């Protein structure tokens, strides 16, 4: 079951053609990740309090249809892969029932500038 994040396109997110600039999709994905973690009781601020940072290793997005100013859309987020050191999320952006973008991001955790294994309490939150 995906985590669903709902949002409306703001005017400043559009480009000269009146569509959402491609870079903003990655902001939407980051917002969805943050809300997903918050909904699990483990927001980024809690990880930072533990001295951990969530670092992006790679990101991919396939754009299928445009979004326009004032469109309401949903980001459906799923945890696709989880290992001791990395985790991967997939995203599908829907406008009504139409998929307008598909993406994934891979992450790791860093403490004191070095990649570390994902702490047990974070693994439990991600698995749940």
Swiss-Prot record:
Its EC number is 3.1.-.-. SUPFAM superfamilies: Thioesterase/thiol ester dehydrase-isomerase. Disulfide bonds: none annotated. It comes from the Bacteria. InterPro entries: 4-hydroxybenzoyl-CoA_TE, HB-CoA_thioesterase_AS, HotDog_dom_sf, YbgC/YbaW. The active site is at 15. Keywords: Hydrolase. One of its GO terms (molecular function) is fatty acyl-CoA hydrolase activity. It is an enzyme of class 3 (hydrolase). It holds the Pfam family 4HBT_2. PANTHER family: 4-HYDROXYBENZOYL-COA THIOESTERASE FAMILY MEMBER, NOVEL THIOESTERASE SUPERFAMILY DOMAIN AND SAPOSIN A-TYPE DOMAIN CONTAINING PROTEIN (0610012H03RIK). Belongs to the 4-hydroxybenzoyl-CoA thioesterase family. This is Putative esterase aq_1494. It comes from Aquifex aeolicus (strain VF5).
């Amino acid at each position: 079951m995906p985590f669903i994040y709902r949002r409306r396109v703001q005017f400043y997110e559009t480009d000269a053609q009146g569509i959402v600039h491609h870079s903003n999709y990655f902001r939407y994905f980051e917002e969805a990740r943050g809300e997903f973690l918050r909904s699990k009781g483990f927001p980024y601020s809690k990880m930072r309090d533990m001295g951990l940072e969530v670092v992006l290793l790679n990101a991919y997005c396939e754009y299928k249809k445009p979004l326009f100013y004032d469109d309401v859309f949903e980001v459906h987020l799923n945890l696709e892969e989880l290992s001791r050191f990395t985790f991967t999320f997939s995203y599908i952006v829907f406008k009504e029932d139409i998929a307008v973008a598909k993406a994934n991001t891979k992450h790791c955790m860093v403490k004191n500038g070095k990649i570390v294994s994902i702490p047990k309490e974070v693994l439990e939150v991600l698995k749940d």
